[in-house]
């Protein structure tokens, strides 16, 4: 690795792995990991696309089932809160066990844990197809699918950093765009099957598609042997890390991911039923949900590229503020299908900004050494707020107004994204202030800098800094 790369102060922390094996400031030897930066990494990127297609992409298709269940009262005794809760469980329940899943794939292997996830997801969809009571749907389309998603996604998200260094956010953006492609397929395809053959065959078809593609991705999955071996030796399972949990920046991280999940999940699960509430059909509602997926397919790679160039927090702060404005200025007055489709396409391109940037931001805050444990805690916060988000979205719906039944939901989602932008703005100021201290004291950007003391006055001065930054942020 050339000396210029180590000296380039504009290089993002995601693009820095200390290759010299020197001791860090705490006396710990840094991990020497070779990153191929291509080669077989392109097959890994393809696998990551397929994993996202089969997990988050398939999960976004639940909006179609939700609208169908609400419209047809499919299961006796099922209320809108029940179906919303099932969607929340599918999205989040497995993520509550993220630290345990992280520990398991370090004990066994990434491939083994992902394989378990594929089995969980396939069994869940197949059993859901033959479910006839509400509690069976809770367990299959809710809990078991949630565990399948978590067992596949949490290990797979670590693959890109092992194979790519330069333009890592771009690679993550391309990979997470797979969820957008999946959303298109599952929103349109499952809606068509559901109308022609019913819920049972829609779930069976989804089972076949997800299991087949995830299995292909699993066969492509490899880890760089040196990186995996070093990482296993260095990994220490810590459910609660005082150094992490006592840091102000980490709680700003927890704040913005919590707000992001409230906005993201409520919006994702509401647009199809919102379109139906305007007087359109379920099929037309699926078109709007599909536009969200089209937007994410096109937008996430672009967001990743821009984040590599200007900084993940800077880009995220701006885009989440734009999201808030779109919800207030476009969703609230929306009265027709054309506006709903345009809104879906616009918000779809930026509402998932968290996915291509989260790894870069977490690493920026805690460094490589504390990354696994911090990610585990972060997933728990995301899971907690994603669990209640669908319920909040439906409860805010009003049926006694003339016009937009979801105007209160739109206001709520707008404030959720405003909260994301605010937390990222504060976090950005904190990181800039800490970077100034770290650069002055000659610390490498990939080291654990949680111990550096940032005064509130110093942070406040950095909130409006946009030029001559010590590092890209």
UniProtKB/Swiss-Prot annotation:
Q: What is the lineage of its organism?
A: Eukaryota, Fungi, Dikarya, Ascomycota, Saccharomycotina
Ranges per topology, Extracellular: 59-83, 136-141, 187-200, 269-286, 333-342, 395-408
Name of the protein in its database record? Probable transporter MCH2
One Pfam family hit: MFS_1
Q: Sum up the protein's function in the record's words.
A: Probable transporter. Does not act in the transport of monocarboxylic acids across the plasma membrane.
Glycoprotein recorded as keyword: yes
What sections of the protein cross the membrane? Answer: 38-58, 84-105, 112-135, 142-163, 170-186, 201-220, 244-268, 287-304, 313-332, 343-362, 371-394, 409-433
Entry keywords, A to Z: Glycoprotein, Membrane, Symport, Transmembrane, Transmembrane helix, Transport
Q: Looking at the UniProt record for this protein, which Gene Ontology cellular component terms does it annotate, in alphabetical order?
A: plasma membrane
Residues with an annotated glycan are: 72
């Amino acid at each position: 690795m050339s000396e210029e790369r180590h000296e380039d102060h504009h290089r993002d922390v995601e693009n820095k792995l200390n290759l010299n094996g020197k001791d860090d400031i705490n006396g710990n030897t840094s991990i020497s990991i070779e990153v191929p930066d291509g080669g077989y990494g392109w097959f890994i990127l393809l696998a990551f696309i397929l994993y996202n297609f089969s997990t988050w992409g398939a999960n976004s298709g639940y909006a179609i089932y939700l609208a169908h269940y609400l419209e047809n009262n499919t299961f006796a005794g099922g209320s809108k809160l029940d179906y919303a809760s099932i969607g929340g469980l599918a999205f989040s329940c497995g993520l509550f066990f993220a630290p345990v899943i992280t520990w398991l794939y370090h004990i066994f292997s990434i491939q083994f844990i992902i394989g378990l996830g594929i089995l969980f997801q396939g069994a869940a969809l197949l059993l859901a197809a033959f479910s006839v009571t509400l509690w069976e749907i809770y367990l299959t389309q809710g809990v078991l699918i949630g565990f399948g998603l978590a067992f596949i996604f949490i290990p797979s998200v670590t693959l890109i950093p092992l194979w790519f260094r330069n333009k890592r956010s771009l690679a993550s953006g391309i990979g997470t765009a797979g969820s957008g492609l999946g959303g298109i397929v599952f929103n349109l395809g499952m809606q068509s099957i559901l109308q022609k053959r019913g819920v049972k065959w829609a779930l069976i078809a989804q089972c076949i598609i997800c299991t087949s593609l995830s299995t292909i991705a699993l066969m492509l999955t490899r880890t760089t042997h040196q990186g995996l071996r070093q990482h296993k030796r260095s990994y220490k399972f810590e459910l609660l890390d005082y150094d992490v949990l006592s840091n102000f920046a980490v709680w700003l991280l927890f704040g913005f991911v919590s707000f992001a999940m409230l906005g993201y999940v409520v919006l994702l699960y509401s647009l199809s039923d919102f379109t139906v509430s305007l007087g359109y059909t379920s099929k037309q509602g699926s078109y709007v949900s599909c536009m969200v997926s089209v937007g994410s397919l096109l937008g996430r790679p672009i967001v990743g590229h821009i984040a590599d160039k200007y900084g993940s927090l800077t880009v995220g702060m701006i885009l989440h503020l734009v999201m808030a404005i779109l919800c207030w200025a476009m969703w609230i007055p929306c009265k027709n299908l054309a506006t709903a489709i345009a809104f879906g396409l616009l918000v779809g391109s930026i509402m998932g900004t968290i996915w291509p940037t989260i790894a870069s931001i977490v690493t920026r805050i805690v460094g490589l050494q504390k990354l696994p444990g911090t990610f585990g805690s972060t997933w728990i916060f995301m899971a907690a707020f994603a669990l209640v988000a669908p319920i909040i979205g439906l409860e805010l719906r009003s049926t006694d107004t003339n016009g937009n039944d979801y105007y209160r939901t739109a206001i709520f989602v707008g404030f959720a994204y405003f909260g994301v932008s605010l937390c990222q703005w504060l976090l950005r100021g904190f990181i800039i202030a800490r970077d100034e201290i770290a650069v002055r004291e000659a610390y490498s950007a990939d080291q654990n800098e949680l111990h550096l003391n940032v005064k509130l006055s110093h942070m406040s001065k950095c909130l409006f800094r946009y030029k001559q930054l010590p590092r890209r942020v």
